[in-house]
């Protein structure tokens, strides 16, 4: 079984929205062994929808459509499918009950103008919408299209995702004879080309059916090890062997396999070793604290964060010496060190991380260009003294990109420091 995804909506073609629905659907289908061979974005024009769906149904077993099921005039997907398949609609009692309940739960009456949201194309299987109002459906398209299946879902991500999890994936699971396994390998502190050179031998020795994809992004490089085959046990074995080989070769740069984030990894290391952390931020403006506290359970290890953006704030809130600021400038390792010391002593945490830099687009100089970042790490030692580590880094990007990269670098330095303090830990998956 192979699939195509058709995303309907003028906003996708005008750049108004990013098509996150397609990536979610593709990943979900991959999990049940259904590869996606094409993703198409289509306007709200009824004739265009018919043309695109006719082409997709003629070359694949399964077409999943998002968008165009709402109650407004520009929602034309249902009408287009009715014309394409030459079928009418019927009211679904179950869909109508869910729609009425949705309005009742909000203290409202169901408007007559929205009853159409409870209609489905004849011969289709209802895909209930427990989050919104538009009913989804699974349609067998008959011999004209080789008995291919068509799935219609709303374009609202939360509604589509709920439908995929509860109805669509269970419906098609087991219909594919192909086993597919994708394993993300998360790296930090190494570039794409350097990583490729490091694991060249492992890539040359990939078993049949296994591929390796490099996905560079703002903060680092993710690898995705993908294995395809007919026997699930063999697919899992081959995939695991490749992942283990990469871990053995490049483990010092790998913080997780799977969907674990760097902040989750740092948090797990802190929690498992009964350690606490505090942060002092300038250029990241609270982003580092935000990422650390995005992790559920972070109250067990996160003590506090101080945003000391101005020089006066660095002096007043953290005790940074004015002479240090005057001698080295705010963006310097000596200031980063004093910021880390200040928040460590004031918070009572075991570890402190500081950031001071130039996010841009202005404010740079010849020796400190835009994208310069200084990080300070301070950690309590068993004898009561404080160990320090500082570093200067150079980034390139927009202000928003630099702030994101600065926070990632700070988390990376915290991760590296923790590995030295508590020893290498099992890679999170």
UniProtKB/Swiss-Prot annotation:
Q: Which Pfam families match?
A: CinA, CinA_KH, MoCF_biosynth
| Gene3D superfamilies reported in the protein's UniProt record | CinA-like (3.90.950.20), MoaB/Mog-like domain (3.40.980.10)
By its UniProt entry, which InterPro entries does this protein fall under? CinA, CinA-like_C, CinA_C, CinA_KH, Competence-induced_CinA, MoaB/Mog-like_dom_sf, MoaB/Mog_dom
Its domain of life reads Bacteria
Supply the SMART domains for this chain: MoCF_biosynth
The record ties this protein, via CDD domains, to: cinA (cd00885)
Q: Which HAMAP family match?
A: CinA_B
Family per record: Belongs to the CinA family.
Name the UniProt record assigns to this protein: CinA-like protein
Say which species the protein is native to: Chlorobium limicola (strain DSM 245 / NBRC 103803 / 6330)
The record lists the lineage as: Bacteria, Pseudomonadati, Chlorobiota, Chlorobiia, Chlorobiales
């Amino acid at each position: 079984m192979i699939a195509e995804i058709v995303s309907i909506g003028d906003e996708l073609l005008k750049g108004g929205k990013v098509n996150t629905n397609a990536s979610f659907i593709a990943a979900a289908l991959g999990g049940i062994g259904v590869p996606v061979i094409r993703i198409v974005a289509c306007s709200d024009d009824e004739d265009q929808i018919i043309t695109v769906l006719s082409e997709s149904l003629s070359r694949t077993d399964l077409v999943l459509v998002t968008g165009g099921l709402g109650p407004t005039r520009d929602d034309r997907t249902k009408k287009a499918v009715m014309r394409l398949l030459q079928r009418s609609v019927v009211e679904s009692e179950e869909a109508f009950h869910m729609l009425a309940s949705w309005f009742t739960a909000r203290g409202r009456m169901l408007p007559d103008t929205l009853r159409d949201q409870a209609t489905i194309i004849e011969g289709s299987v209802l895909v209930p919408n427990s989050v919104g109002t538009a009913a989804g459906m699974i349609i067998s398209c008959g011999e004209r299209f080789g008995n291919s299946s068509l799935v219609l879902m709303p374009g609202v991500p939360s509604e589509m995702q709920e439908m995929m999890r509860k109805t669509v994936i269970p419906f098609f699971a087991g219909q594919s004879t192909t086993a597919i396994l994708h394993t993300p390998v998360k790296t930090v502190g190494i570039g794409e080309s350097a990583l490729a050179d490091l694991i060249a031998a492992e890539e040359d020795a990939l078993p049949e059916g296994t591929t390796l994809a490099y996905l560079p992004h703002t903060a680092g490089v993710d690898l995705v090890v993908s294995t395809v085959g007919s026997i699930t046990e063999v697919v899992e074995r081959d995939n695991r062997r490749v992942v283990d080989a990469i871990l053995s070769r490049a483990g010092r740069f790998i913080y997780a396999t799977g969907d674990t984030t760097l902040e989750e990894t740092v948090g797990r290391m802190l929690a498992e070793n009964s350690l606490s952390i505090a942060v002092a931020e300038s250029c990241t403006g609270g982003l580092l604290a935000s990422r650390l506290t995005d992790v559920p359970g972070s109250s067990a290890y996160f003590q506090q964060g101080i945003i000391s953006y101005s020089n006066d704030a660095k002096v007043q809130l953290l005790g940074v010496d004015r002479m240090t600021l005057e001698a080295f400038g705010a963006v310097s390792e000596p200031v980063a060190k004093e910021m880390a010391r200040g928040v460590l002593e004031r918070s009572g945490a075991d570890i402190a991380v500081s950031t001071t830099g130039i996010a841009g687009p202005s404010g740079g100089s010849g020796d400190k260009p835009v994208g310069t970042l200084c990080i300070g790490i301070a950690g309590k030692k068993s004898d009561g003294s404080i160990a320090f580590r500082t570093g200067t880094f150079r980034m390139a990007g927009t202000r928003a990109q630099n702030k994101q990269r600065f926070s990632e670098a700070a988390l990376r330095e915290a991760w590296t420091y923790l590995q030295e303090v508590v020893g290498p830990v099992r890679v999170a998956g």
